[in-house]
């Protein structure tokens, strides 16, 4: 049996061909409709007695259905241990003398629409929702139909936890939310997938050439890494798959998105259910698990369950 021999010249030829193919496919796709994303400038003031410190940053994004307006007020937390404000009778620990206040709510547990409505019914002038634990500085524009009369922005988990812990320590926190810059999403998902495939293919041929031309000495570390990769693939294959269909609650536009790609779930989407019961698009989570082995939300290791 003879195998194709990959040489640097072959690699260059293949890469050039792939580039021409990508340009052809790029020009073949119909124009995608641009979708505006508005950032939010947050002027945050921390007051302890007579000591006041402030910080200003473009640290949030407006929700897709939020009015683009300036709003300000003292920050109030949901009462009780749970900070997601999913219970319809949730109260907020706001100062009585405050004329205007903003609800700080944790993402998760229910839809964005429900959280915002709970805060609005309690008299909030705006809602700040901070992302899941473990998402670091990631934010995205929320979908919350039916709440178009109240300003709603998302901030990162890191910034949300900073404000939360400050208030829990007795710090008086006020926030001014102002409209930031507009960004357009001109690139369609098809083109994103195309360039992802193109980059992965070129990287494969490049690394393959390097691998073939570099002397290799087998060692225990290499064998161990190969065994772990094999174990991860087996563990992934044993995880449950599910095809979403009309009527599933995950298809509600107000439900949480896939945290890997931030796309909403649609009928016929194939999702992978992890042992921790979190689920994601199969096409998104499989590469993630191969690289990280852990759930992107709770860090559950699929090899330890």
From Swiss-Prot:
Domain PA residues, every copy: 65-167
A Pfam short name: zf-RING_2
Membrane topology, from the record: Single-pass membrane protein
A GO CC term assigned to this protein in UniProt: Golgi apparatus
Superkingdom of the organism of origin: Eukaryota
Glycan attachment positions: 43
Annotated TM spans: 185-207
Keywords, ordered alphabetically: Glycoprotein, Membrane, Metal-binding, Signal, Transmembrane, Transmembrane helix, Zinc, Zinc-finger
Tissue: Abundantly expressed in testis and slightly in pancreas. Mainly present in the interstitial cells of testicular tissues.
Zinc finger (RING-type): 258-299
Signal sequence, start to end: 1-34
Residue ranges the record marks as coiled coil: none
Swiss-Prot/TrEMBL GO biological process terms: ubiquitin-dependent protein catabolic process
Localization of this protein: Membrane
Main location: membrane
InterPro entries (alphabetical): PA_dom_sf, PA_domain, RING_finger_E3_ligase, Znf_RING, Znf_RING/FYVE/PHD
One Gene Ontology term of the molecular function aspect: ubiquitin protein ligase activity
SUPFAM superfamilies: PA domain, RING/U-box
PANTHER family assigned: RING FINGER PROTEIN 130 (PTHR45931:SF21), SI:CH211-59O9.10 (PTHR45931)
Record-given protein name: RING finger protein 148
Gene designation per UniProt: RNF148
């Amino acid at each position: 049996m003879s195998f194709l021999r990959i040489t640097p010249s072959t690699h260059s030829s293949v890469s050039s061909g792939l580039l021409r193919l990508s340009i052809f496919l790029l020009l073949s796709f119909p124009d995608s409709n641009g979708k505006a994303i508005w950032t939010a400038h947050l002027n945050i003031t921390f007051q302890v007695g007579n000591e006041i410190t402030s910080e200003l940053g473009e640290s949030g994004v407006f929700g897709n259905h939020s009015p683009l307006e300036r709003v300000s007020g003292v920050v109030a937390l949901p009462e009780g241990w749970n900070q997601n404000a999913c219970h319809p009778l949730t109260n907020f620990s706001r100062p009585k003398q405050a004329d205007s206040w903003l609800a700080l709510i944790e993402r998760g547990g229910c839809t964005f629409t429900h959280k915002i409505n709970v805060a609005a019914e309690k008299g909030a002038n705006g809602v700040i929702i901070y992302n899941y634990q473990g998402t670091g500085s990631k934010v995205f524009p929320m979908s919350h139909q039916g709440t178009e009369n109240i300003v709603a922005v998302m901030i990162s988990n890191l910034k949300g936890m900073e404000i939360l812990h400050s208030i829990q320590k007795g710090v008086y926190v006020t926030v001014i939310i102002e409209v930031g810059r507009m960004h357009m999403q001109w690139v369609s998902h098809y083109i994103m997938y195309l360039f992802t495939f193109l980059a992965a293919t070129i990287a494969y041929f490049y690394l393959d050439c390097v691998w073939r031309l570099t002397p290799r000495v087998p060692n225990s570390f290499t064998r161990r890494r190969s065994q772990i990769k094999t174990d991860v693939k087996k563990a992934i294959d044993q995880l449950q798959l599910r095809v979403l269909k009309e009527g599933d609650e995950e298809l509600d536009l107000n439900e949480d998105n896939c945290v890997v790609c931030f796309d909403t779930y649609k009928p016929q989407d194939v999702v992978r259910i992890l042992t921790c019961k979190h689920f994601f698009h199969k096409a998104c989570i499989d590469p993630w698990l191969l690289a990280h082995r852990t759930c992107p939300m709770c860090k559950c290791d699929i090899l330890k369950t």
